[in-house]
């Protein structure tokens, strides 16, 4: 339970970090969608470990195998199964963690809930679970692009206390991929890289914020009350490992404004589409997209598994210390960028199909 997401465009992920592999089944993808298989692999390459000096040194090719649902690269409308085999496991690095709970990790809560857990590699709590999400999200992104020209672009907005200045209206994927931290602000990116390296050398970790914009989103996506678009986006990105906060549009800063300043005034347009003078709403009003860019921010905590010695307890509840071995990211944000893009794309693809099914018959 808890490994499936979506209603019409639905995914189910499977696998553990140190098991045979991880993957996903995508159910509900429309037929006759021509897929760029290299684009799926490209997104997985952006997520994979060992890609730079500021990520975990674990070496995985993360080569995706597509087992079903396609004919000559075109979707059949049947379930699409994708798997990535694990190659570079080192379970010996987790010996100490078999008897001591990692502070702020899922070790203790998984043990309390299930009475058993895959300690090696973190099991389902490992970020390797997100491989399936990124692969499925790459399909969703292609569906959105082909259907409406929709673009989903995320980037690192903040690392520790270093915040970048980025214009969401003009940022490009090339700017995001222009450096290893995936921050379009080149000057700030270098400072971020230095900060991550310095904190990592201390045996510690740091967190930050990822920002994501959706351009050319369809108008009318989202449902009233419980299935509001921003609510589903929040659930989607907050289901990613290490997430601790979500904002849309003006977010918490909007609480400092008066209504007269915060309201997005509607402007007349020649084609009759909705357009606003400002976008404090973040592209969503009443839980439904209004056609303006959707802008969200996601906060990620510092990586829980660190080399610095920490106080903890063992499975018997006895006090002990833990200095985690293994290969872990000093900061998850550079690799989390494609994860955020994937989850946003999955939500939008699901709501696009729901919108078409409910409101496009006549």
Swiss-Prot record:
GO cellular component, one term: cytosol
Pathway(s): Metabolic intermediate biosynthesis; chorismate biosynthesis; chorismate from D-erythrose 4-phosphate and phosphoenolpyruvate: step 7/7
GO biological process: amino acid biosynthetic process; aromatic amino acid family biosynthetic process; chorismate biosynthetic process
Pfam families assigned: Chorismate_synt
Cofactor comment text: Reduced FMN (FMNH(2)).
Protein's UniProt name: Chorismate synthase
GO molecular function, one term: FMN binding
Gene: aroC
EC nos: 4.2.3.5
Assigned keywords, A-Z: Amino-acid biosynthesis, Aromatic amino acid biosynthesis, FAD, Flavoprotein, FMN, Lyase, NADP
Entry's family note: Belongs to the chorismate synthase family.
Cofactor needs: FMNH2
Cited function: This reaction introduces a second double bond into the aromatic ring system.
Ligand binding (NADP(+)): 47, 53
Keyword Membrane: no
First-level EC class: lyase
Gene source species: Synechococcus sp. (strain CC9311)
Binding-site list for FMN: 124-126, 286, 301-305, 327
InterPro entries tied to this protein: Chorismate_synth (IPR000453), Chorismate_synth_AroC_sf (IPR035904), Chorismate_synthase_CS (IPR020541)
Catalyses which reaction(s): 5-O-(1-carboxyvinyl)-3-phosphoshikimate = chorismate + phosphate
Assembly information from the UniProt record: Homotetramer.
Keyword Amino-acid biosynthesis on entry: yes
